Structures are given as C-alpha cells and as structure tokens.
Amino acid sequence: MRKIITSLSSVLLIFAASLSYTGIAKSAEFFTIGTGGPTGVYFQTGNAICKMLHKSAISAEHGRKKGTAKAYRCTAPSTGGSNYNIGQIKAGEFQFGVAQSDWQYHAVNGSSKWEGKQFSNLRAVFSVHNEPFQIWARKKAKIKNFSGLKGKVVNIGNPGSGQRGTMEELMKAMGVDNSFFKSTTELTSSEQVKAMCDGKIDSFGYSVGFPNGAMEQAATCAAKASPINLTGKEVQGLIDGADYYAKAVIPKGTYTGQKKDATTLGVKATVVTSADVPDELV
C-alpha cells in the first residue's frame, strides 16, 4: 500500500510540474536571434543574450524582484552570418540578429548586395564589439600584403556571411575578381581554420574581434599563420568613403608568433531588429 501511495504521489508531482511548465510556456514569448558559425563570436553573443533572458525569466517565475515581468524564451541558432540574419529578419523569420555595421548600413540604404532589396525598417539595438577585417596567411605562402594573394588559394567566405561581403568590397576596391587568385573556396568561419591548418588554403579573410581562439589556433598549428597588413590608397579610400569603416590595428603579440602590428580596416558588430518587432520585446 505504501508503494502505491508513493507511486501515486510521484505521478501527481510530475503532473503538477507539467501543468506549471505548460502555463509558463503559454505565457512566454518566443523569439529567435540569428548568429553566425558555431565557433564564432556571433554565436556566443546570441546565446549569451538568451541565457541572460532565461535567467531573468526564471527569477520572475520564482517571485524574485530582479526578474522580468514577462517570460521570454529565445533560441540563437548557428547561421550563415550578417546578411543571412538581416534577410531572415526582413522575412519575419528572426526577430533579432547579429550583423556587421557595414551590412546593416547597406541593407537600410539598399546599396551593395542590398541594391533593389532595401530594408528600411531595419533597426540597430546596440553595438557589441569592434571587428577588424583580417586577412590571415600561412607562413610558407609568404604573403605580406593584398598583392601577395595573387595566384594563391584563398577562402573568400560562405555566401551570405559578413566576411564574404567585406572581402568582395575589398576586392572591388583593389580592382580584382576571383581570377586574381589561383582558386577560391567558400568555407564558413568554422571551417576555414582547419582547412588552413591542413594546408588546403593559403589565406582567408575574416571580420572578428581579438583575441580570438580560432585565430590563435591558426597561429599555432602547422600553418603558423598571422594577419597581414591591409593598407594603401585603395583601403584608405574604403575608409574615407564610408562612415562604418575605420582604421584598425591588431597589436603585435596578440597572437603567438605575431611580431609586428597588423594594420587593417574594421567595422562594429551590432545586434539588429525590425521596426515591426514590438517595442516591449526590444
């Protein structure tokens, strides 16, 4: 008899818990934050935001003063990056996304890759961190600057990513296309370092804050890679011609084996949304 009562009590507790969870789920508002590759900073940023919101929601559910008045549940899946996130927000599939400030500008103004697809309702929520655009090269490739990429195997980034867009902007400013390289790849940010360490590519371009764990891996693996300088009148022209670009420097010693400063240009990582998303959620 005691066993029956104990079992019945357990069932009732589980049932009560499920009702409680169902009530919370029904009252919660779900939304999605687009991020980037699973090893990148955007993915970490999106999931950190979700974690903070979940913690706040749990506090409120338990009657704590610092909790939110309304329960929010969010997901932050790995995605193709900046332009993909903006496109999904425009389509109403995502409510938020992390994106480079340059692609935020182009989407709002209908320029560059967003020509004919203007997204005037795109809004910035806040900036996260600075992101220098870095071109990394393996040591044996002997690449010192952009001209040294001629005849090399270069990863230009996956379609829809911020790194792909910025690389194409830089190539356009330099007056070159894909034929300038021996060949190009379209690897994601999470794939490119392994490809370099395995000797499959000579170089890649990437917009990312520093220091970065994946870049340190590129510096310490068999590639012995390091960031190169991006300077000259063409790069300065990009900086002078756009408010979202600025000169950036990766100080020497940031990465293993980096003996000199690497001068380049950079943008900011921003969390963006749509004007159609309710103010209460933002």
Language-model segment annotations:
Residues V98, D102-K142, F146:
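Signal peptide-directed extracytoplasmic domains
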Residues A28, A69-A71, G81-Y84, A91, ...:
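Extracytoplasmic
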Residues F30-H62, Y72, E131-D198:
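Bilobed "Venus flytrap"/periplasmic-binding protein-like clamshell domains
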Residues M1-L12:
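Bacterial N-terminal signal peptides that target proteins for export
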Residues S101-W103, S112-K113, A141, D177-P278:
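Pocket-lining segment of extracytoplasmic ligand-binding domains
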Residues V11-A25:
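C-terminal segment of classical bacterial N-terminal signal peptides
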Residues T32, T75, Q95-Q100, A124-F126, ...:
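Structural recognition of the beta-strand scaffold that forms the well-ordered cores
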Residues N47, K65-G116, S190-A195, I201, ...:
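Pocket-flanking alpha-helical
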